Structure formats: structure tokens, C-alpha cells
Amino acid sequence: MAEKMALAKAINESLRRALDADPKVLVMGEDVGKLGGVFRVTDGLQKDFGESRVIDTPLAESGIVGTAIGLALRGYRPVVEIQFDGFVFPAYDQIVTQLAKMHARALGKVKMPVVVRIPYGGGIGAVEHHSESPEALFAHVAGLKIVSPSNASDAYWMMQQAIQSDDPVIFFEPKRRYWDKGEVDTEAIPGPLHKARVVREGTDLTLAAYGPMVKLCQEVADAAAEEGRTLEVLDLRSVSPIDFDAIQASVEKTRRLVVVHEAPVFFGSGAEIAARITERSFYHLEAPVLRVGGYHAPYPPARLEESYLPDLDRVLDAVDRSLAY
């Protein structure tokens, strides 16, 4: 049955469903229990499932992830919350040297069904450590799945799939979209976790994005349509692995590609996409692959945030430059 709900509520309902279905599923993190999380994504879960299933932890991200690894080795499926994107770095060692490598290190004999939830990105007027987009730092690490939903339906179903995965999943939640509402069919049959989806058909140029930038790309496509240009919008959904086949298929139709993400353009995921698509589809391209993202600079104070983040004008400028070739 379909129900309209906010993206944050969709994650809450997905966690609730997983906790109810499997006693081995646990939710852990700073203030996830009594408070229900800073963004109230876990609101009510501790009340309904108890303190042994929804666990308030100390302020120690390394310890949170390390504990989750140990629980996974004992057959549990922990879902841990990192309160803000910039707080994940104390746990980076545990994620990179242990969580990502445990399965290969044990020659496939152990599973690592751990989900690391990270609210990420800007757009809420916060400061550094609260508004960053570090997904590329994790995409470089083999052994991790990295996903970011753009809408409530994907948030619900991608969380279900992440919890059911026997491999670790870094689940980046676009906090500026937490309150965006959409239809969620809790009885649907979802597609593969890593598959991209065309959310708008077009023939003149492909816009590829994930997480918070998908909505922006749809707004860009609306603006371009007023000038008679039809842009295809591709929601990548997964940063690692990336559905290069879907990008290639779209580009070989439109012959132009602009990749949009909040993370800095320098060494961002868009660089890998640009390189791969240039290798795969060079003779189909009528313009260089362009990228729009954050600047290679520390995240600015809130009053400068709008100047730092990709916006309608910056993406439209990239579209114009691509179509001018």
C-alpha cells in the first residue's frame, strides 16, 4: 500500500520493519534511542523495541563502528548512525582497515552485515563537520557498498536492502531532503540496490546525480524545457558500485553528460564517471564530460553556503557550455 511520507519518516519506517522482522537487527548510535536522533529519524524505535535493540552509545564513533563489527561477527545485523557527516572520521580507521576488509581477510568465511548511516551534505545552514560530503573518500575503498537515496521511496527500500546485505553498506542520507515527501509503496518489489534509474527522459543531454542533487537536476531540466531543450536526468543511487552501463546507455542517446554532486569536484566521484564514460563512449560524445560540484575548499560558514553549493545557475551554465560544442 502506498503512503506519502517524508524521507526521514521513510527511513524510520524501514528500520522499524527490519527490527520487527529480525531480532538480530540492532540500531546503535549517539542519541538514537531516547532522543530519536538529532533529525528524529529513529524516533520511537527504542520505546517500541527496547534499550537492548536500539542502543544509545557514548560519543565515540570509532567505538560505535568497532562494536558493530564485533556484533556482526557474532551474527547480528547492526545499523549504526554517525550523527553528522564530519563526525565519521574518528571511525574511518575501523571502516577502512576492518569493516571493508574483514570478508576478504577471512577468505570469505565471515560476513559483515553492517550498515553505517551518515546524514550528509549542506543546505541546512550548518557549519563544517555538519555539512560535508565525504562519499568519495569511501568510494576509493574496496569492500564497501556506498549508496545515497534521493527520495522517500528509495530511502525506504534501499535501507531494507542495505540491512539484508551481507556486505557493509555506507548509507549516505541527504539531510536537506529529510523533509521532502513522496509516495512509498511498502509492498513494492525493489530493483537491485546498485542500479541507476532514469527519472526524466530526454534527448539533448544527460544529467547524472545522486542524493540531494537529483532534485536540483530535475529543476534544471524544467528550466531547460522552457527553452525547448530536453534533458535526461539519471539518478545514480549508488556511488560504489556505479552503474556505468546505465550512464553509457543514456550518454550514447544524448551524446552529452554533466555530472552533479555536492562533494568537491576535485577527485570527486564525477571524475571517475567522466574518465570511464570517456573511455567507453568517446566516439559517441559531442562534448567533454563536465562536472558541477563543491569547490576545493573547506566548507564555509553558513552565510556563504549558497555560494559554495551547486545551484540552478551553475548547472545550467554547464549545460549551456556542453550544448555549445
Where are these regions (language model features)?
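Thiamine diphosphate
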Residues: 1-168, 172, 307, ...
